[in-house]
């Protein structure tokens, strides 16, 4: 007796662009689709429809998003667009009129509904067959995960359009955040990377109201959240920390080993004049004093930051002020961007002199050379010391991992020459044998 084979599950291709916050959005959409019986495939040719999660933070990111949308249309033909650039539906359709649907950031239900319209889910789908793990679908390696604690931002930095794309701050309930963190740890995650548009503002919008986790009260506030996360027994790393005064409360937690002594805090510039034009905190002298105090409390503290050079009105004097400030601050990990005007940003309306492109490039190169010397000198101090390393990759040559001062994708690596016996997700103590401006070399102890 012949039997009719069951129809195949509908298949979705997915391209995720932009920052870790967008990656978390992609994970949420994929989790919902997987729960409904969709298979996620890795090639355009195998997909019944392709979803592109776009980035719209700067013009180069928009250009990349439009290029990827075009590639997906060429290779597949059925394309749904979502994410930050989705707020510019007109611009997207002007370039790619054949896209099937366009939705903005955080519009998870609309994306899933758009997929339903193009490729309906199987009517006889049995959720017990296509089980989704409790932690959901993750696009990161199994041993680390991003934990998004809020959406949106209440600031009005003149170079940024995030509030217009993602709205005002909306903090997730603290119990929900901690439940997710606990599920991730139970699934094998060894490192939680706490992210949002403005991590240190967590709870401001709900006046730090008290929530509950595991039957105990917990305030919706950054310090209390970190205290609770520290009980899970994994690395907890903080990203996108705006320099509020209450950030000082986090440093003792780092000194006590409750969370990693790693602070990702974007200063953007040091010149008071430029910071004022950016609508950023302009207390560079107090910032230096705070950094000094933080390091006195927690000597192992690693500070990562990002800066913008070539902002409208930036003079050579302003730029030199920034270089001198970097010398004083002795930051560990630093990224730098040349200012790029973004459509809709308030900075476009400032009556300030535009910095020529060749001057921007020159300042960027000087900035990077200046900071590389600082970063290299600070890493040289690690030679001979023992560090704990979380392994990311292993091959016959050895292992590649990160220690507490390395976030994935953006910071350096630790190369373990005798680490071919290890596996991703292992934690191992090593002795540092060499260093350059970004990376360390070490041997297992």
Swiss-Prot record:
Binds 2 [4Fe-4S] clusters. One cluster is coordinated with 3 cysteines and an exchangeable S-adenosyl-L-methionine. [4Fe-4S] cluster 1 binds at residues 19, 55, 84. Its cofactor is [4Fe-4S] cluster. [4Fe-4S] cluster 2 binds at residues 153, 157, 160. It catalyses: L-aspartate(89)-[ribosomal protein uS12]-hydrogen + (sulfur carrier)-SH + AH2 + 2 S-adenosyl-L-methionine = 3-methylsulfanyl-L-aspartate(89)-[ribosomal protein uS12]-hydrogen + (sulfur carrier)-H + 5'-deoxyadenosine + L-methionine + A + S-adenosyl-L-homocysteine + 2 H(+). Belongs to the methylthiotransferase family. RimO subfamily. HAMAP family: MTTase_RimO. Catalyzes the methylthiolation of an aspartic acid residue of ribosomal protein uS12. This is Ribosomal protein uS12 methylthiotransferase RimO. It comes from Pseudomonas fluorescens (strain Pf0-1).
């Amino acid at each position: 007796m012949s039997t009719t084979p069951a129809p195949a599950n509908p298949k979705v291709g997915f391209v995720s662009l932009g920052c870790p916050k967008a990656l978390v959005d992609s994970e949420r959409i994929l989790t919902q689709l997987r729960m409904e019986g969709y298979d996620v495939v890795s090639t355009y040719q195998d997909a019944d429809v392709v979803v592109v999660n776009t980035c719209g933070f700067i013009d180069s990111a928009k250009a990349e998003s439009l290029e990827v949308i075009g590639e997906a249309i060429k290779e597949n033909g059925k394309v749904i667009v979502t994410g930050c650039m989705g707020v510019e539906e007109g611009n997207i359709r002007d370039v790619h009129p054949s896209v099937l649907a366009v939705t903005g950031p955080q519009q998870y239900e609309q994306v899933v509904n758009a997929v339903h319209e193009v490729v309906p889910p199987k009517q006889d789908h049995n959720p017990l067959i296509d089980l989704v793990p409790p932690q959901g679908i993750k696009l990161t390696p199994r041993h680390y995960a991003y934990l998004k604690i809020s959406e949106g931002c209440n600031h009005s930095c003149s170079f940024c359009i995030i509030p217009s794309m993602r709205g005002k701050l909306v903090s997730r309930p603290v119990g929900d955040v901690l439940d997710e963190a606990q599920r991730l740890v139970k699934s094998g995650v060894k490192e939680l990377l706490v992210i949002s548009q403005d991590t240190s503002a967590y709870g401001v919008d709900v006046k730090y109201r008290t929530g509950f986790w595991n039957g105990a009260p917990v305030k919706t506030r950054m310090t209390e959240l970190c205290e609770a996360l520290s009980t899970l027994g994994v690395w907890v790393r903080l990203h996108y920390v705006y320099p509020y005064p209450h950030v000082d409360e986090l440093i003792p937690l780092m000194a006590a080993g409750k969370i990693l002594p790693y602070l990702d805090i974007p200063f953007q510039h040091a010149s008071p004049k430029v910071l004022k034009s950016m609508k950023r905190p302009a207390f560079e002298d107090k910032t230096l004093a705070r950094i000094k105090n933080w390091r006195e409390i927690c000597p192992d503290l690693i500070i990562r930051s990002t800066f913008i050079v070539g902002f409208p009105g930036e003079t050579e004097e302003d730029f030199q002020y920034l270089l001198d400030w970097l010398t004083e601050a002795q930051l560990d990990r630093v990224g730098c961007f040349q200012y790029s005007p973004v459509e809709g940003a308030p900075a476009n309306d400032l009556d300030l002199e535009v910095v020529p492109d060749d001057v921007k490039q020159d300042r960027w190169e000087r900035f990077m050379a200046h900071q590389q010397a600082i970063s290299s000198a600070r890493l040289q101090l690690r030679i001979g010391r023992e560090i704990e390393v979380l392994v990311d990759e292993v091959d016959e040559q050895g292992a590649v991992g990160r220690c507490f001062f390395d976030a994935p994708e953006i910071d350096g690596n630790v190369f373990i020459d005798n680490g071919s016996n290890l596996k991703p997700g292992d934690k191992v103590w090593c002795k540092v044998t060499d260093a350059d401006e970004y990376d360390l070399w070490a041997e297992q102890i």
